[in-house]
Swiss-Prot record:
Membrane-spanning ranges: 9-29, 60-80
Record membrane topology: Multi-pass membrane protein
A GO cellular component entry from the record: cytoplasm
Keyword Cell inner membrane: no
Protein name: Uncharacterized membrane protein C21C3.06
C-alpha cells in the first residue's frame, strides 16, 4: 500500500525532496562539526597562525561544495519540470537532442582546404 503511494510521486519531485533534505542536513552537520572551532587546536599562537588559513579554506570549500551540488540538483529539477520530462534518462535524451550542434562533425577535405598544405594524400 505504501508502494502505491510512492508510485504516484514523480521522479523529479523525489529528486528535489532528497536534494533539499540533503542540503539541509549537510548544512546542519557542517555547522555542528567543521564550521565550529575545533577543540584539538593548541593555544600556541604559532600553530594557530599556521593552521587558521587552512581551517578557513576548508570551511569555504566545504560550504561551497555543498551549495554547488544542491544548487545544481535544484536547477536540474526545475529544468526537468519546465520541459516536462519525468526522469533523468528522458532529460539526457532531450539534452542530447537539443545540444546536437555541439557534437564534432567531420569536415570534408579539412587537410587539403589550406592553401599551403605540405601533406600529400595518395
Amino acid at each position: 500500500m505504501a508502494f502505491d503511494k510512492l508510485a504516484n510521486v514523480a521522479t523529479v519531485d523525489a529528486i528535489f525532496a532528497i536534494s533539499s533534505s540533503t542540503f539541509l542536513w549537510s548544512t546542519w552537520v557542517l555547522q555542528r562539526t567543521i564550521l565550529k572551532r575545533p577543540n584539538f587546536f593548541s593555544p600556541n599562537p604559532v600553530v594557530e597562525k599556521m593552521v587558521h588559513p587552512t581551517l578557513i579554506t576548508w570551511k569555504l570549500f566545504s560550504f561551497t561544495s555543498v551549495l554547488t551540488v544542491s544548487t545544481f540538483t535544484f536547477a536540474s529539477c526545475l529544468i526537468m519540470r519546465t520541459i516536462g520530462v519525468e526522469n533523468i534518462k528522458e532529460f539526457g535524451l532531450y539534452a542530447r537532442e537539443k545540444l546536437s550542434f555541439a557534437r564534432a562533425k567531420p569536415v570534408k577535405d579539412d587537410i587539403t582546404s589550406f592553401p599551403n598544405h605540405k601533406i600529400s594524400i595518395t
